[in-house]
From Swiss-Prot:
<keyword id="KW-0808">Transferase</keyword>
<feature type="modified residue" description="Phosphoserine">
    <location>
        <position position="190"/>
    </location>
</feature>
<keyword id="KW-0489">Methyltransferase</keyword>
<dbReference type="GO" id="GO:0032259">
    <property type="term" value="P:methylation"/>
</dbReference>
<dbReference type="InterPro" id="IPR029028">
    <property type="entry name" value="Alpha/beta_knot_MTases"/>
</dbReference>
<comment type="similarity">
    <text>Belongs to the class IV-like SAM-binding methyltransferase superfamily.</text>
</comment>
<dbReference type="Pfam" id="PF02598">
    <property type="entry name" value="Methyltrn_RNA_3"/>
</dbReference>
<keyword id="KW-0597">Phosphoprotein</keyword>
<dbReference type="InterPro" id="IPR029026">
    <property type="entry name" value="tRNA_m1G_MTases_N"/>
</dbReference>
<protein>
    <recommendedName>
        <fullName>Putative methyltransferase YMR310C</fullName>
        <ecNumber>2.1.1.-</ecNumber>
    </recommendedName>
</protein>
<dbReference type="GO" id="GO:0008168">
    <property type="term" value="F:methyltransferase activity"/>
</dbReference>
<dbReference type="GO" id="GO:0005634">
    <property type="term" value="C:nucleus"/>
</dbReference>
<keyword id="KW-0539">Nucleus</keyword>
<dbReference type="InterPro" id="IPR003750">
    <property type="entry name" value="Put_MeTrfase-C9orf114-like"/>
</dbReference>
Length: 317
């Protein structure tokens, strides 16, 4: 009898769903007094984003908060690093985050893992068939390639957090990419194949993150070529605007991607004013939103407004 264990793949059809992007301002942490408080506030955002299958988290930089002192790291970059840290497998963190960021991640390292992420199901990391990995440069490029001066942009080697890199069976992939690996077949697989039986799946690493340094960047530099299907403003304070209240969402069958912007009106107005020369015929930020969804509790904190809003969207619409 063979001692080789046979693994059976179980693939489930993906259900059609709505995809959400969250936009949070850097004022998220304006009331925090130290790194520990900032870390806990961002952890709440990461926890609810992963719980509700959020696809993207955008950090809107409030330029009015930038002070004259020279900081080693900006508030936006700190929030970004923390958000990425919470969705990075423990065995890859030393690779992903260089020494510049590690002093800012000490408090984050003491917090519990996000249990909704597929790759946290195995407490003993070596027991999982599927692992997250980072593609790294070929270790020994051929002399022929060196002579003709070609840049080595593809690789078969994957850093999966072990002492030795994994070599793919018959694939070449771009370097510096995040991938999901089947360690038995030594092939890159889709997140659906690896984690399709796990509640909370939306992408292989939880959510995509980016910084919007301006109002223009928020809408024009997203990951979707066709843009967002619908943009919804979630006011954090009571303020009359001409934006109509949300009455419906695109049907799930169309796989829509909805942008939810959590902010006070003053923050949005400041960001728009700084970019006003880009929108000559626009009267204000209200023209960029299809609807607004007031938070059940007025004057809410961003971290509190996120779960309330996502719960409303998942139950009412």
């Amino acid at each position: 009898m063979s001692s080789t264990r046979k693994f059976k793949k179980v693939e489930k059809p993906l259900s059609q769903t709505r995809h959400y992007s969250l936009c949070i301002p850097t004022t998220l942490v304006s009331d925090c007094r130290n790194l520990s408080q900032i870390t806990h506030k961002v952890y709440q955002v990461a926890k609810f984003a992963s719980l509700f299958n959020v696809s993207e988290v955008v950090i809107l930089e409030d330029n009015s908060q930038v002070d004259a002192t020279k900081k080693k790291i900006s508030t936006a970059k700190l929030i970004l690093a923390l958000l990425q840290y919470f969705v990075t497998p423990p065995y890859l963190r030393n690779t992903v985050f260089n020494e510049k960021f590690r002093p800012y991640l000490t408090a984050a390292s003491k917090l519990p893992r996000l249990s909704t992420l597929p790759f946290t199901r195995y407490q003993k990391q070596d027991h999982g068939r599927y692992r997250e990995g980072l593609t790294i440069k070929m270790q020994k490029p051929t002399l022929a390639r060196k002579k003709i001066g070609k840049v080595f942009k593809q690789t078969k080697y994957i850093n999966i957090g072990k002492s030795k890199a994994l070599a793919l069976q018959s694939q070449l992939v771009p370097i510096n990419a995040r991938v999901t690996i089947d360690t038995i077949t030594r092939k890159i697989v889709s997140p659906q194949e690896a984690y399709g039986d796990f509640t909370g799946l939306d992408s292989q690493y939880g959510y995509y993150t980016r910084i919007a340094s301006s109002f223009t960047d928020l809408f024009m530099k997203g990951p979707l070529k066709e843009g967002y299907t619908q943009s919804v403003y979630v006011p954090l304070t009571t303020r009359d605007t001409s934006i109509p209240e949300l009455s419906s969402l695109p049907t799930a069958e169309t796989n829509p991607h909805i942008l939810l912007v959590f902010s006070t009106w003053d923050t949005l107005a400041r960001a728009f004013k700084l970019d006003q020369d880009q929108f000559v015929d626009c009267q204000g930020p209200q023209e960029f939103f299809d609807a607004q969804l007031p938070c059940p509790v007025s004057n809410s904190d961003v971290a509190d407004a996120i779960p309330m809003t996502l719960t409303t969207l998942s139950t009412v619409f």
